[in-house]
């Protein structure tokens, strides 16, 4: 935060150089995340695509990578995408992304995650916006999450 503040205040020396370095690292991590998912592939469920990055993609950028997969050609825009990544506290961070077209068809990822996490219980938490949302679950809840989330989306999207 200090770096960003100093750059906004006009620093074009040390802090600007640091900001450029941080930006380059961020772009590198995104590029590597996209390449990893192109290599590993994305799985397809009835109502969504998903991938489990484990700890290979930082949980802080896994949602960005998920959204970028639409533009990279790795997935079509006909279903939302769900991304799993390990969080530092040994929980699983879930990031979901949709498209404007899916929103027009009734998609609400925030609601779907909230409902799914309520059914999972055991400290699962989720919510967000129609087009992008997130959740945190225990690692042993991934399979149940996929099934419940699939059912939740079936009740939303209409052709």
Summary of predicted features, one role per range:
Residues 46-159:
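Glycine-rich, acidic loop segments that terminate in or are immediately followed by a histidine
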């Amino acid at each position: 935060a200090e770096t960003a503040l100093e750059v906004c205040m006009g620093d074009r020396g040390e802090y600007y150089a640091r900001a450029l370095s941080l930006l380059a690292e961020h772009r590198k991590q995104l590029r590597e995340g996209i390449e990893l998912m192109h290599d590993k592939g994305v799985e397809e469920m009835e109502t969504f695509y998903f991938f489990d990055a484990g700890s290979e993609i930082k949980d802080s950028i896994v949602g960005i990578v998920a959204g970028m997969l639409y533009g990279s050609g790795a997935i079509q825009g006909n279903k939302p995408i769900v991304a799993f990544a390990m969080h530092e506290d040994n929980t699983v961070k879930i990031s979901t992304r949709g498209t404007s077209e899916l929103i027009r068809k009734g998609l609400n990822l925030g609601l779907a995650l909230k409902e799914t996490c309520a059914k999972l219980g055991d400290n699962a938490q989720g919510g967000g916006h129609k087009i992008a949302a997130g959740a945190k679950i225990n690692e042993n809840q991934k399979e149940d999450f996929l099934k419940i989330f699939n059912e939740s989306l079936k009740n939303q999207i209409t052709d």
